[in-house]
Amino acid sequence: MKRIVTLVSREQAEVGHRFRVFGIPDECRECRLYSVCLGRLTPGRSYIVVEVRPSMGQKCKITGGEMVPVVVEETPIVGLLPLNKALEGVVVTYEDECAGCDGCPSNMVSKGEKIKVVKVLGRAKCRGREFAIVEFYALGAPSLSGASSAGISQAPSRVPLSKPPSKSPSPQKSSPRGPTSRLP
C-alpha cells in the first residue's frame, strides 16, 4: 500500500500504532501544518504507523502537544460483501448491499466506489442473506456528504483501532482524549 508522511502526537508516534481518521476539525484546516498533517489523510480510513522520523518540535494548534513526523500506511477495511463479489484480488464496485449490520462498511466506503478485495475471512448473515467477511482497500476517497448520518463524527479526528480486525467487525468508538489517542 501507499506510504504517507504525516504528523501524529508524541504518544501515537510508535511503530505499529493504529488509528482511524473520523473527520477534520475546522481548526485543523486553518493550521499552517494542515497540508503535512491531517490534510494528507482520508476521513473514514484507518492507518498504521510504519516508521517514526525525528521530531522537528512542531506543536498541535488544538492540543498544544508535540507533533512527530511518521510514515503511515492505510490498513484494509473489514466488512461484508455479497458472496459473488468476495474473490481475493478482484476490483469491484461497492453497492452498499448490506446496510445497517455491525459488519457493514457503509461509513467508510461510498456506494459506487471501487474497492479491491485482499482477503476473504469467512461468512456472515445480514438480514437473512449470506455475505462474505472480507478485507479490502477502497481505491478512491469516500464521499463524506452526510457523514454524520453515516456514523463519522467530526471530533475526535483520529482514534485508535482498539483491536486488530476480527471475524465479526464492530463499530469503532471515539476517544475522549482529543484529536489523537493511543491504543489501550
Swiss-Prot record:
Residues 146-161 have a biased composition (Low complexity). InterPro entries: UPF0179. Residues 146-184 are annotated as: Disordered. It comes from the Archaea. It holds the Pfam family UPF0179. Belongs to the UPF0179 family. This is UPF0179 protein Pcal_2106. It comes from Pyrobaculum calidifontis (strain DSM 21063 / JCM 11548 / VA1).
